[in-house]
UniProtKB/Swiss-Prot annotation:
It is found in: Virion; Host nucleus. Its main location: virion. One of its GO terms (biological process) is endocytosis involved in viral entry into host cell. It comes from Human papillomavirus 27. One of its GO terms (cellular component) is T=7 icosahedral viral capsid. Belongs to the papillomaviridae L1 protein family. The keyword Disulfide bond applies. This is Major capsid protein L1. HAMAP family: PPV_L1. Keywords: Capsid protein, Disulfide bond, Host nucleus, Host-virus interaction, Late protein, T=7 icosahedral capsid protein, Viral attachment to host cell, Viral penetration into host cytoplasm, Virion, Virus endocytosis by host, Virus entry into host cell. GO terms for molecular function: structural molecule activity. Self-assembles into homopentamers. The capsid has an icosahedral symmetry and consists of 72 capsomers, with each capsomer being a pentamer of L1. Interacts with the minor capsid protein L2; this interaction is necessary for viral genome encapsidation. Interacts with protein L1; this interaction enhances E2-dependent replication and transcription activation. Forms an icosahedral capsid with a T=7 symmetry and a 50 nm diameter. The capsid is composed of 72 pentamers linked to each other by disulfide bonds and associated with L2 proteins. Binds to heparan sulfate proteoglycans on cell surface of basal layer keratinocytes to provide initial virion attachment. This binding mediates a conformational change in the virus capsid that facilitates efficient infection. The virion enters the host cell via endocytosis. During virus trafficking, L1 protein dissociates from the viral DNA and the genomic DNA is released to the host nucleus. The gene is L1.
Length: 594
């Protein structure tokens, strides 16, 4: 409409209409209509112009007469664009000449909807949706404090020591660069003495714990642990000038400090680690001395596993045959790194609903490796020397360093409150257990102990003394748990059974197997030689899925208390909530009759 008004108000104008539809859709009966006018339009002229435009459309498409009267109503919406019962109509203003004004061509169209002639794609099969625990778990206002006693461990920082003919473990390996995975066992709230007997209905509901606060206490002073190898594969100091050495064994006694790491991960399942291990070759085409293929491997992080120290998350026992490319404490071990990607993408979010980490490292020394080069440098990368035939080792390596440790950068000895987990599990302790994975290399000091072999020590002689190395660790774990209840409707029971059937077994809500319609044979005397040999009964599946794994067990089943103000973490919890203890220990006085 605005376009038509502009035309009608101009002193000189020209309008040309031309059908653009294909000949098989809109036949062309007359040539395009050309109109030219000079001078401003009078009201009567505007009416004439409108009629001429309508006439041009009618002449270019006779079918327009079928619903021509409706055009007067549609014209108010747009004068150059109409819809004709499923047929495409194109109207184009080819040229519009105004005095000293350039106007571009305007093209208007409307597509015709046709049935889809391509392949029909069915929607994907619906899958069960994982819902948050906040949907079907109801939280109460009852809180408990649970804390461990002082937890201590002492051992050798590089290797375990075995003595005797039976290789009895005398001193375990305890390093500041090991994972500490605490398996915290909680009491069953359904067998707990509650302050309010009407808190839940035992016929249709079950109780469980939700972790809402945690503090990992660390004792011992800050310190940097040093590791090394008496036969470290260090050929040259590539940071400084050197001379090529053709010795067969150029290993040296080298020590270093590792990357600095602080982390702890909280979940109701153990943390998942990742590392690179030795893979398999296709068709057995590998020969002795070939580079081993690498395979990405996931595994559960257990207590005592080595952390990634700056040399990579590798299985050094299978990928480094010389036992001298890394220090003693990891040369025959697997260094694992937490698989944060997999734990974050876990459907139910049980392995990591709370985590903290801090890592830092820089490179201190630069070396290269001694040995025969497995990969040859391409000739186009360098110009050969006329005096040196062998360019030497180009397998460069470095020694890591975690730099300075400071109390200002500590993640421990601080309370943390869990309000919203990153996954669907918002702190629910399924199975009355939680797993706490801890790494703290800022307290990795290795102490030296010395014992004299002779009583007369007036004159110093190094061979009269024996030197020992030990590492000590100290922990204190405190938690705040919130009592929650869950109503076991058929839908919720089916959902929990799909998530973990053992939970319903622990709650005495077992799902019986479907009845068998086939007839089974049962012999009476199973040990009789008169009958065929009977298959042994399959072993019963252990109820504890982590029985064969190594964890530091912490039993809190007798350490729960509602007196939050009697514990450091409990007082901090009450302070941040702005509340005071609501449970009264006073008994109501009972009146006596006289």
């Amino acid at each position: 409409m605005m376009f038509m008004l502009i035309l009608m108000s101009c002193s000189h104008w020209t309008i040309t209409t031309q059908p653009l539809a294909a000949p098989w859709l809109i036949p062309r009966y007359l040539p395009p209509l050309h109109l030219h006018c000079e001078g401003p339009l009078q009201p009567l002229s505007r009416v004439v112009l409108m009629c001429l435009c309508i006439l041009g459309l009618i002449l270019n498409h006779p079918l327009f007469l079928v619903w021509g009267p409706s055009f007067l109503w549609l014209h108010r919406c747009h004068p150059l664009f109409t819809y004709l019962g499923g047929i495409i109509i194109y109207c184009q203003v080819i040229s519009c000449g105004l005095n000293d004004v350039n106007v571009s061509t305007i093209s208007l169209q409307m597509a015709l909807w046709r049935p889809n002639e391509s392949k029909v794609y069915l929607p994907p099969t619906p899958v069960s949706k994982v819902i948050s625990t906040d949907v079907y778990v109801t939280r109460t206002n009852v809180y408990y404090h649970g804390g461990s006693s002082r937890l201590l461990t002492v051992g050798h920082p590089y290797y375990s020591i075995k003595k005797g003919s039976n290789n009895r473990l005398a001193v375990p390996k305890v390093s500041g660069y090991q994972y500490r995975v605490f398996h915290v066992k909680l009491p069953d709230p359904n067998k707990f003495g509650l302050p309010d007997a009407d808190l839940y209905d035992p016929d249709t509901q079950r109780l469980l714990w939700a972790c809402v606060g945690v503090e990992v206490g660390r004792g011992q002073p800050l310190g940097v642990g040093v590791s090394g190898h008496p036969y470290y594969n260090r050929q040259d100091d590539t940071e400084n000038a050197h001379t090529l050495d053709s010795a067969e064994d150029g290993r040296e006694n080298i020590s270093m400090d590792y990357k600095q790491t602080q982390l702890f991960i909280l979940g109701c399942k153990p943390s998942i680690g990742e590392h690179w291990s030795k893979g398999t070759t296709c068709n057995g085409s590998s020969a002795a001395g070939d580079c081993p293929p690498l395979q990405f491997t996931n595994s559960t992080i257990e207590d005592g596993d080595m952390v990634e120290t700056g040399f990579g998350a590798l299985d050094f026992a299978t990928l480094q045959s010389n036992r001298s490319d890394v220090p003693l404490d990891i040369c025959t071990n697997v260094c694992k790194y937490p698989d944060y990607l997999k734990m974050a993408a876990e459907p139910y979010g049980d392995s990591m609903f709370f985590s903290l980490r801090r890592e830092q490292m820089f490179t201190r020394h630069f070396f290269n490796r001694a040995g025969k080069m497995g990969d040859t440098i391409p000739d186009e990368l360098y110009i050969k020397s006329t005096t040196i035939s062998d360019p030497g080792s180009h397998v460069y390596t470095s020694t890591p360093s975690g730099s300075m440790v400071s109390s200002e950068q500590q993640l421990f000895n601080k309370p943390y409150w869990l309000r919203r987990a990153q996954g669907h599990n918002n702190g629910m302790c399924w199975g009355n257990r939680i797993f706490l994975t801890v790494v703290d290399t800022t307290r990795s000091t290795n102490v030296s102990l010395c014992a004299a072999e002779v009583s007369d020590n007036t004159n110093y002689k190094a061979t009269n003394f024996k030197e020992y190395l030990r590492h000590m660790e100290e922990y204190d774990l405190q938690f705040i748990f919130q009592l929650c209840k869950i109503t076991l409707t058929p839908e919720i029971m089916a959902y929990i059974h799909n998530m973990d059937p053992q939970l319903l077994e622990d709650w005495n809500f077992g799902v019986p197997p479907p009845p068998s319609a086939s007839l089974q044979d049962t012999y009476r005397y199973l040990q009789s030689q008169a009958i065929t040999c009977q298959k042994p009964t399959p072993p019963k599946t252990p109820t504890d899925p982590y029985a064969n794994m190594t964890f530091w067990d912490v039993d809190l089943r007798e350490s729960f208390s509602m007196d939050l103000d009697q514990f450091p973490l409990g007082r901090k919890f009450l302070l941040q909530r702005g509340t005071t203890p609501t449970v009264s220990r006073k008994r109501t006085a009972v009146g006596r009759g006289h």
